[in-house]
Amino acid sequence: MGQDVRSPRGPRCIALVGPFQSGKTTLLEAILARTGAIPRAGSVDDGTSVGDATPEARHHKMTVGLTAATTSFMGDSYTFLDCPGSVEFAHDMRAALPAVDAAIVVCEADEKKLPQLQIILRELEELKIPRFLFLNKIDRANKRIRETLAMLQPASRVPLVLRQIPIWKGELIEGFVDLALERAFIYREHKASEVVALDGGNLDREKEARFSMLEKLADHDDALMEQLLEDIQPPRDAVFDDLARELREGLICPVLLGAASRENGVLRLMKALRHEAPGIAETAKRLGAPSAKDALGFVFKTLHSQHGGKLSLTRLLAGHLDDGATLQSASGGTSRISGILAVNGAYDTKRATADAGDTVALAKLDPIKTGDTVSSGKTAPAALAAAEPTPPVLAISVAATDRKDDVKLGQALMRLHEEDPSLVVVQNAQTHDTVLWGQGEMHLRVASERLRDRFGVKITSHPPAIGYQETIRKPIVQRGRHKKQSGGHGQFGDVVLDIQPLPRGEGFRFAEKVVGGAVPRNYIGAVEEGVVDGLARGPLGFPVTDVQVTLTDGSYHSVDSSDLAFRTAARIGLNEGLPQCQSVLLEPIHVVEIVCPTDATAKINAILSARRGQILGFDTRDGWSGWDCVRAMMPEAEIGELIVELRSATAGAGSFTRQFDHMAEVTGRAADQIIAAHQHAA
């Protein structure tokens, strides 16, 4: 059965993860209250919780960003990371997971949330993070525990091992039996559970359930298997050792019961963490951190406060760190620490030092960003694995309500991206708009609120412009002539342009076939610049593409000709020639790949068809039981709000990626409406 793995492992860091509204923040409050970190548990609904302390979280009554809080239990220090359950804010969870020793997956007996649970468990499995499953809201249970476990098991690749069974009183659960301890407890609201005699029907149920637990442990322990075959009861300490080892190695996912709102099951959960969760040495090994005397840390979250400046939430993987130390980053930055702060939800308590295992906030590490590996050594450390931001799926164009705030807006957007890399800011080269990309409606709404409340920038927003273009069907030869006489040197340029359509996707080509020096070679570049100017806005009001323009002839004046004159002449030639070329509107088409639970595939197909999507096919999602992957061609104009419908149809579990494929013609009434709307907006 191996050696005892339950020795103290230093300060530990535990992630609280789970589907949206499963009770993670309520569990954090219960943990902090039961361990004495706060006098009593706060409430999400009342806006008094430690976890949802930001104005945005309290306004929306949901976790919209990671919160870290530290407590102590039986002499050990624990930092809990309350991670958002909404898929729109999931990057905070992904960025933090490499730093944790273990995760508590908070869930409930709700089949609708099973796909969300599967996504979270898969993330933990791939990162090899030990995990407990806390079956919350057990006071509202309307299913027997075996039925619930059978429902949840498909979400996990490894066995869900029941550590406790409920004690029923009629149709209500009044306590539980700990299968490893072989003790029975009756819940007491907001108090420690009361130990009661294990007898009668509960004893029979305990023996059956305990044997089932031991059988699952024995799948990875030959000595235990032999004992079970010989009808020998294994020592209790040996069972705990097996639970700890198999948890650490990712062979099982223990399941514990409770009701966070009543603080039921919290102390047993803490004891399971204390006995079984790995410590910082195992976590550093899992991450591939090198052995060194220097301090080594992983930055998993960046925060900007109105008055406190930049804070980098950091897990110290090894070594000792003093305030004022200089840190080297794997990304190349160097910075001196301007303060070490304890993480207690508010980040306002100073510390002089930090040691391996501690989770702290480091002040004003300006070049250092989320996902960086930092070291107090003289050379930059090797980078440890960091989460890549999820590609954004929804965008808005933003502008400062007061133009005097334009620079301030740019700085604030940069800080928002630093805090949350899944928010992406781009400049539209065609419209020069600032476009803010995010993970959904709520994600963008909260970003707008933070711009206003934290950075003092009010914004206006609207849907971003679609990348429409236009092309031509008919060739033409057009002269462009610019002549201006205003005393002294005049302006003269004369060009003949052959304008030809190109196959779709060829873009723009320029050529010259001038003979006899009709247009001197030093003016050819100016002619091309004028052509580009003329193609920037065609007769329909959009950039022109898939066109070749050839300079074939022209004339010049030895005194009055100049680069400006020939550039102007070429632009005039385009502006006069293009309206005669039978312009046609083009819209961008993307390949969209959607992943969704199989039972939602029919709904997804209907949504795609209603949005002018051309379904290319679908297949089962590789390695994901009960999931499909649907591929389709879709106009960019129809993708804008796709994520809203997709999440509505999949209980928040569906997602998609997109890739530009080609430009396609738009004709008839649809084209007329697009052109009219564009001209009205201009």
Model-flagged regions — what are they?
Residues M1-A682:
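Structural and coupling elements of P-loop NTPases
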